[in-house]
């Protein structure tokens, strides 16, 4: 009975998604250019940059998200509920809206540059952020900080604060009690949040294309370029397989950590 209920959806996916995908991949794999040295170099370069920017984005997100998670979990202050809710808004915004917002704030004719130009009597924008690695990292942190706040914050709120108090009674200061008691208990949730953020950054497309441009080509951006601009299906197929395998590996690792 359940299979009958799912049959139309499975048929639709098979006919309009999986079949075209398999045919396109087959066209690329059958080509002699699929594993040509040039194709492998493009794949290695895009994979290397994808891993690098995802790692940097993840570390910056943890740097901001972990203190914020501790603040929301351990302290009560006016507007806490509203502020915590607002941290989730970026995660729900479309990429185009975020890119437009960054351009309005940090672009060459954005609010920040125009303000500095008026204050300092400058003729050219003093700050260049868009179409740089910094713009990509800022956008990823903007998007994904809420993941760390919620995953780690929820785990922290479930911990008994008396554990820290007991450690301090036994002679440890607040910093030592955190590292020896709280951090080991939070380690699984921190690793889970870090891996989830890394996965989102690894598969990021719109942010990198709109704020970084083609010069910062991750695997997904390179697939877009090779397919639509270069019409190079063999390289696109190779990159798609690499992306699929990496995403599958990260997803399995994340599921094992839950």
PLM regions and their residue ranges:
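Short alpha-helical segment immediately N-terminal to, or the first helix within
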Residues: 36-37, 155-156, 180, 210-213, ...
